[in-house]
Amino acid sequence: MKVSYKSNADKVSADFKRAAEKALTTSALLVEGDAKLRAPVDTGNLRSSLNHKVETDRATIGTNVEYAPFVEFSTSRTPAQPFLEPALRENKGKIQKIFAEHIRNATK
């Protein structure tokens, strides 16, 4: 009796990688959008500068506005007005669901 075996490990690995990248992108957009809603508005520059970047295994949400850290964390004269950290913290459950859904769909 002859038994043959064909591995699909490469396909499964590629499917999981694509699912993770899609989940990262979806999650980054979620947090970025929430941070934009939370960002204090004076000129609107801070809010409009928020963006995201997705790499293979991480997503970065941030801004290039020089004064953003002072808004998020405070100065000696100005109280903190956090917008990034709360956006991430408040969406952790949704992010977990996004990843679970994308991974589950990759296994179908």
Where are these regions (language model features)?
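Short, Lys/Arg-rich flexible segments
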Residues: 1-108
